[in-house]
Amino acid sequence: MIKIETVLDILKKDGLFREIIDQGHYHYNYSKVIFDSISYDSRKVTEDTLFFAKGAAFKKEYLLSAITQGLAWYVAEKDYEVDIPVIIVNDIKKAMSLIAMEFYGNPQEKLKLLAFTGTKGKTTATYFAYNILSQGHRPAMLSTMNTTLDGETFFKSALTTPESIDLFDMMNQAVQNDRTHLIMEVSSQAYLVHRVYGLTFDVGVFLNITPDHIGPIEHPSFEDYFYHKRLLMENSRAVIINSDMDHFSVLKEQVEDQDHDFYGSQFDNQIENSKAFSFSATGKLAGDYDIQLIGNFNQENAVAAGLACLRLGASLEDIKKGIAATRVPGRMEVLTQKNGAKVFIDYAHNGDSLKKLINVVETHQTGKIALVLGSTGNKGESRRKDFGLLLNQHPEIQVFLTADDPNYEDPMAIADEISSYINHPVEKIADRQEAIKAAMAITNHELDAVIIAGKGADCYQIIQGKKESYPGDTAVAENYL
């Protein structure tokens, strides 16, 4: 529960409060109202709910519907002129985050918080950190792939970073479940729409940056995308940064007065003797490590997670055991066909991650390579050109273009857009299962490989705005082994 006096104090302190409007009368103070719940979903309200009217798609009808269920108060950036009082604020999403924090008892103060950001690798690094901290502590984890608040039950997340009310609710559940740490992914969108507003992390990790999530409903430019990624650094007590990433110099300047560790070729924390399933580290993590996830970028993610966990109480032994134990569904999963050919299933869904995936596979597999790939509809449109230009440089790869969450677009039109940048023949098969079957049929022996990119462990296709059931790339590939 939360008193209205507390709500108003929080909003005023942060410069978010404008006024209360009740039946046309303006108020600066108010008392004798207590809220037993908070919500941004108009279908989940009672007479004791404080409701947040948020989002570009919010309609007055939602509010009127909530009032028929007994709703008596709401927060908004404007007066919707309905028959209940409104708390007017300058920024509804900032207000929601601060009120949620207080409503759930400030759970962020009772947990050690670790956050990862980057264009790619967030989920893998989060899994490494979870497995490392599980050796000697009781972590909770919020990830794109899986969320656990008790260390035993896992469920799929709807967003990379949950809405603030859901986030602080989950943190509170983690506290109730006697968790000691919380590891989470923080997207640029989370800062763009203030899902983590007011939250300070104990350690923030910046893995890498490449142009992505640039489009009409995401970030208008790379500058905007990079700026919102960097906000994690100024909202973390200590930071870990990949010194080999693009634009590292500006990050180095930004964090010079903070506790920090840099890893990569320019600093002490480096990777040596990199092999498929092992590597050595220098610097703070000096030693030899076993790893199940193939690829140098996964070793970089492991080092980033290790450095972060070292600051949060993990021992070097914990770090070695945790890295060795880590597997991630849909992230560099490897299957073997009856003819010995390898099938690599990975979430790689932008030009840079696909480039790294191809390089890793071609390092270990020197025969025929087939690639199954699509690009999402109605978002990340810049990826299509990136994919096409990349694949134009790889005439040795037999490309099968197919559907990958086409949404309201025609998957074959997306395939045509990708192939317009490719000067050699490609196959186009709308049905993803058929595309996988066709790609796997071209292999003959153990040096051949099939790369199935984009969906990872997702068991759905987004079509016409809805998640339609799909067996998942791993299950489909297993049918044709």
From Swiss-Prot:
<keyword id="KW-0547">Nucleotide-binding</keyword>
<protein>
    <recommendedName>
        <fullName>UDP-N-acetylmuramoyl-L-alanyl-D-glutamate--L-lysine ligase</fullName>
        <ecNumber>6.3.2.7</ecNumber>
    </recommendedName>
</protein>
<dbReference type="GO" id="GO:0000287">
    <property type="term" value="F:magnesium ion binding"/>
</dbReference>
<keyword id="KW-0132">Cell division</keyword>
<feature type="binding site">
    <location>
        <position position="195"/>
    </location>
    <ligand>
        <name>UDP-N-acetyl-alpha-D-muramoyl-L-alanyl-D-glutamate</name>
    </ligand>
</feature>
<comment type="function">
    <text>Catalyzes the addition of L-lysine to the nucleotide precursor UDP-N-acetylmuramoyl-L-alanyl-D-glutamate (UMAG) in the biosynthesis of bacterial cell-wall peptidoglycan.</text>
</comment>
<keyword id="KW-0436">Ligase</keyword>
<dbReference type="InterPro" id="IPR035911">
    <property type="entry name" value="MurE/MurF_N"/>
</dbReference>
<feature type="binding site">
    <location>
        <position position="42"/>
    </location>
    <ligand>
        <name>UDP-N-acetyl-alpha-D-muramoyl-L-alanyl-D-glutamate</name>
    </ligand>
</feature>
<dbReference type="GO" id="GO:0047482">
    <property type="term" value="F:UDP-N-acetylmuramoyl-L-alanyl-D-glutamate-L-lysine ligase activity"/>
</dbReference>
<feature type="binding site">
    <location>
        <begin position="160"/>
        <end position="161"/>
    </location>
    <ligand>
        <name>UDP-N-acetyl-alpha-D-muramoyl-L-alanyl-D-glutamate</name>
    </ligand>
</feature>
<dbReference type="InterPro" id="IPR036565">
    <property type="entry name" value="Mur-like_cat_sf"/>
</dbReference>
<dbReference type="InterPro" id="IPR013221">
    <property type="entry name" value="Mur_ligase_cen"/>
</dbReference>
<dbReference type="InterPro" id="IPR036615">
    <property type="entry name" value="Mur_ligase_C_dom_sf"/>
</dbReference>
<dbReference type="Pfam" id="PF08245">
    <property type="entry name" value="Mur_ligase_M"/>
</dbReference>
<dbReference type="InterPro" id="IPR005761">
    <property type="entry name" value="UDP-N-AcMur-Glu-dNH2Pim_ligase"/>
</dbReference>
<dbReference type="GO" id="GO:0071555">
    <property type="term" value="P:cell wall organization"/>
</dbReference>
<keyword id="KW-0131">Cell cycle</keyword>
<dbReference type="InterPro" id="IPR004101">
    <property type="entry name" value="Mur_ligase_C"/>
</dbReference>
<dbReference type="GO" id="GO:0051301">
    <property type="term" value="P:cell division"/>
</dbReference>
<feature type="modified residue" description="N6-carboxylysine">
    <location>
        <position position="229"/>
    </location>
</feature>
<comment type="similarity">
    <text>Belongs to the MurCDEF family. MurE subfamily.</text>
</comment>
<dbReference type="Pfam" id="PF02875">
    <property type="entry name" value="Mur_ligase_C"/>
</dbReference>
<dbReference type="GO" id="GO:0008360">
    <property type="term" value="P:regulation of cell shape"/>
</dbReference>
<feature type="binding site">
    <location>
        <position position="187"/>
    </location>
    <ligand>
        <name>UDP-N-acetyl-alpha-D-muramoyl-L-alanyl-D-glutamate</name>
    </ligand>
</feature>
<keyword id="KW-0133">Cell shape</keyword>
<keyword id="KW-0573">Peptidoglycan synthesis</keyword>
<keyword id="KW-0961">Cell wall biogenesis/degradation</keyword>
<comment type="pathway">
    <text>Cell wall biogenesis; peptidoglycan biosynthesis.</text>
</comment>
<dbReference type="GO" id="GO:0009252">
    <property type="term" value="P:peptidoglycan biosynthetic process"/>
</dbReference>
<feature type="binding site">
    <location>
        <begin position="118"/>
        <end position="124"/>
    </location>
    <ligand>
        <name>ATP</name>
    </ligand>
</feature>
<keyword id="KW-0067">ATP-binding</keyword>
<dbReference type="GO" id="GO:0005524">
    <property type="term" value="F:ATP binding"/>
</dbReference>
<feature type="short sequence motif" description="L-lysine recognition motif">
    <location>
        <begin position="404"/>
        <end position="407"/>
    </location>
</feature>
<keyword id="KW-0963">Cytoplasm</keyword>
<dbReference type="GO" id="GO:0005737">
    <property type="term" value="C:cytoplasm"/>
</dbReference>
